[in-house]
Amino acid sequence: MKIIKMLWACLVLIAMNSFSQKVQKAAFQVVPLGVKGGIDEKNLSAYLITPSNTKDYICLDAGTINSGIEKAIENKVFRASASEVLRKYIKGYLISHSHLDHVSGLIINSPADSSKTVYATNGCMEMMENHYFNDKTWANFGDQGVGLPLKKYHFQTLNFNEETPITNTQMTVKAFSLSHVNPYESTAFLIKNGNDYALYLGDTGPDAVEKSNNLQELWTAIAPLIRSKQLKGIFIEVSFPNEQPDQFLFGHLTPKYLMQELHELEKLAGKDSLNGFKIVITHLKPPAKNIVKIKEQLKTENDLGLKFIFPEQGKSFEL
């Protein structure tokens, strides 16, 4: 009888553990405002992310803003006007680099926006101040730089490998350097909320082609978070199919190079550590046939058990 009771208790514990794993809440909500890597100006790189229990979003890059908000409203992600989402829900912007497909939405929507902080590393911030918000290309909506600053946006420079609070949110960010046609830089952002993390990479080429060790250093930094299961997902670009020659990658990844890099990450994090891990594929470049090919190649080459997410504009998902 005692043995039966012990077995019953074990079965109950196993069932409870299984149930708790199934109902475990997601750490972050993501709303893609733009997902493509070119041509379609109404659907360029921009991702809202927030802890699952808040509506205080930070925008990861800002290629497209308003069109993405309107699409999200169509999909009933937001039950508010586009103006309210822009002005009240988006608490700030993290800009990985200053290429137009990552900043054009920020620039165009700045007159209608509310006061908030724009975060970027020094090189990116200088480009935006000197070439965009300069009273020539566009009014200076910042609080520093050339021309007459209108002081709507606070321009905050991020130091690499230094944790910075994101104003008016529960989150912090740590910036890491990426190589995007060496010696030009892009940025990865490690977002933290409590004990949970998400990693977003701006445009990047593979270390082998870029002749850099930026990704290796990034993988080394985040490997412990993979092991501890605190990192809930990685946003990373795949711009071209494998047929794209190295000399025409222009600081981007293919499925082959992404998998090579993720194998390097698995070496650091441990065997099978990426099984079931969420990888959000960003920056797919048209034409449509190339995007189809990229997805097929990723599926074929996925020998790590990764869970690929192909985000759609205006459709939210969880990490």
What residue ranges belong to the model's regions?
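Pre-active-site segment of Zn-dependent metallo-hydrolases
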Residues: 39-94, 104-111, 210, 214-222
